Regions:
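RNA-binding basic/glycine-rich loop and surface signature characteristic of RAMP-family CRISPR effectors
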Residues: 1-165
Length: 165
């Protein structure tokens, strides 16, 4: 019997972890892959891992550790022209056959009709760096490959940030 106390409806997990900014944003100047960043408190820049990237890395880890229970759900391309979408194929799988659909939820659109959606029980938010990004860059060139045919190397720069998130 409940005796008047409310039961918890959710569990929240908050964690701090050290990582590199693993997801990239648009390229700057053609050959500089940038990290995802946001500006706060006037002019301080912080990198972040998007919730899409967090979901990706979490699912990939679960799939590697528990492959039989966390197999990837199949996807289909639906729609036509500029209205094409890639989505889970819920006509052939469901929350009982694929833990991914149960845990993270889904939205399934049907052209011209109301879509079907299921809110996942695992909610994920973006991970924002606890330390500011100070413009760190990695400079690379393919010297080894360019040397083989006797051509010039192609320089590539990329933004980097290691922080606690």
């Amino acid at each position: 019997m409940n005796s008047g106390r409310s039961l918890p409806s959710a569990i929240t997990l908050t964690m701090i972890f050290e990582a590199s900014a693993l997801n990239r944003d648009e390229k700057i100047g053609g050959n500089i892959p940038s990290i995802k960043k946001l500006t706060r408190f006037g002019s301080k820049t912080y990198s972040y891992l998007s919730k899409v990237a967090m979901r990706h890395y979490l699912f990939e880890t679960l799939n590697k550790l528990y492959g039989d229970d966390w197999k990837p759900a199949g996807c289909v391309e639906s729609g036509s022209g500029d209205n094409k979408v890639v989505q889970f194929d819920i006509t052939k799988q469901n929350i009982l056959t694929h833990a991914e659909l149960d845990a993270f939820g889904y939205m399934y659109t049907i052209g011209g009709q109301q879509g079907i959606s299921r809110k996942g029980c695992v909610g994920i938010t973006k991970a924002i760096a606890l330390e500011t990004w100070e413009g760190d860059m990695q400079f690379n060139a393919n010297h080894d490959l360019a040397r083989r045919p006797g051509t010039d190397p192609n320089p590539v720069n990329k933004e980097e940030h290691v922080s606690y998130y």
